[in-house]
């Protein structure tokens, strides 16, 4: 029964990552600049979660200390998305994704530090292996050190908010967490707009209005590609290790490329490097549950002995 539940959880996780892979396509379809996009995405998401909470008749009441903790994580999420888009602007998509590949490696150190446990050697090794897999796929370009540095910061923030969400998921419902985090991310993005536009977009005018089908793509992005996967991911953190989730998340660009080819008919060819890099990541993702199970068995034997 436990194995069946775990397999189901991992299949759900892969489905969520497939949905997140679709966000890259939506990003191409939406005409809004990056931070305005983050603002509308989080605004729509927070309203959508509020509607779900209303129909489920769940409570939104939290103590002030709990509220500060959850909304603090929401600010980290907003900072992660902002630095992610900034990195892509400073460098290239491949450099940005190469930096983001370090998320699982950061998690291997942050999770034990936050939870006061020992660092697991195989998590560090798998984190490094996944980085090599993504470097093979995207063939990292040198000369973009500032963009890479910002991407590393974004990856650190992603690892940090994931680990903190793992702790919050033990005490609060996924919908409570998602609502307040999306609300905080939305408010922080709104406060950051003047600074972001002045520093990172050559002082362009803030673009509030959308065009053509932007409203539809924003609704899909905010509701289907954010509310559902974010809430379910928080729920999965109650049962799956945060490292395992972040390790599997490295398949998002792979799924995104495949979906882009299928849906948009992208001209990019699936090179041998793509298949080799994907294989490296897949092996890392698939071997982690085995190593984790082996580690738990070894500890159990030591305890009994």
Feature annotation, model-predicted:
Residues 10, 97-102, 165-186, 226-262:
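Helix-helix packing/entry segments at the starts of transmembrane helices
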Residues 25-28, 49, 107-109, 144-203, ...:
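Transmembrane alpha-helical segments that form core, pore/gating elements
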Residues 32-79, 102-107, 159-164, 179-199, ...:
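Transmembrane alpha-helices of multi-pass small-molecule transport proteins
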Residues 49, 71, 119-138, 271-292:
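Hydrophobic transmembrane alpha-helices of multi-pass small-molecule transport proteins
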